[in-house]
Amino acid sequence: MLIVLSLGGSILAKNLDPDRFLKYANALRDISKKHTLLVVTGGGEAARDYIGAARAMGADEVTCDYIGIEITRLNARLLISALGHDAYPEIPSNYPEASKAMTSGKVVVMGGVTPGQTTDAVASILAEYLRADLLTIATSIDGVYSSDPNCDPCAVKYEKISPEKLINIVMAIEMKAGSKSPVDPVAAKIIERCKLDALVMDARNPDLLVEVICGEAAKKSPVSCGTWITAKK
């Protein structure tokens, strides 16, 4: 399968721990033995810190976005270093470059691309552009809930939902102050328009990422650590 993985900066780059990068690199190696893999890295806490500092100095939002993109690309560079010869050595700056890099047979790693888009959105657009078989959004939340579980103790987790239902959930959550959706609205719309199979999962344990993608992805069977998004009945 051709898989695009959105790897959240909050789980990859937590405390900039080299061992964490190496563990994710090992997981990605294992996945790439069975699948063609492209990874989009998030910015995590470092991106938020830099953007916060820029805003405090009066930077406009486009500048803040570019700062965030640079941090995601730094995380991509660190992950490439951890992967060594198993990674494509350069960071694609756009979707055609990523497509070309994919032909190398290596794990392709990239960061943000365009101001105003999260790396989840970048990953979903990349998956659409490449006609990927699966988009995996690896985060610290174990799937999609009816509302933000951090704010609502009665939130219900879904094993499988349609893209249309995902959009309704995402928009409802985003409208509530202090609430955060596991998938951003742009990514949700891309998933809907291209009828892309996607998995939102808790990937704080890199080994679990391998287990799910290599073991359950082809079957689309329920997983305890995530939610499937599929247009297929």
From Swiss-Prot:
Q: Does the keyword Protein biosynthesis apply?
A: no
- Positions of ATP binding: 9-10, 44, 48, 139, 145, 148
Q: Subcellular localization, per the record?
A: Cytoplasm
Q: Which reaction does it catalyse?
A: UMP + ATP = UDP + ADP
Indicate yes or no for the key word ATP-binding: yes
Among the Pfam families in the record, one is: AA_kinase
Under the subunit heading, UniProt states: Homohexamer.
What is the role of this chain?
Answer: Catalyzes the reversible phosphorylation of UMP to UDP.
Recorded protein name is Uridylate kinase
Please report the organism this UniProt entry assigns to the protein.
Answer: Methanosarcina mazei (strain ATCC BAA-159 / DSM 3647 / Goe1 / Go1 / JCM 11833 / OCM 88)
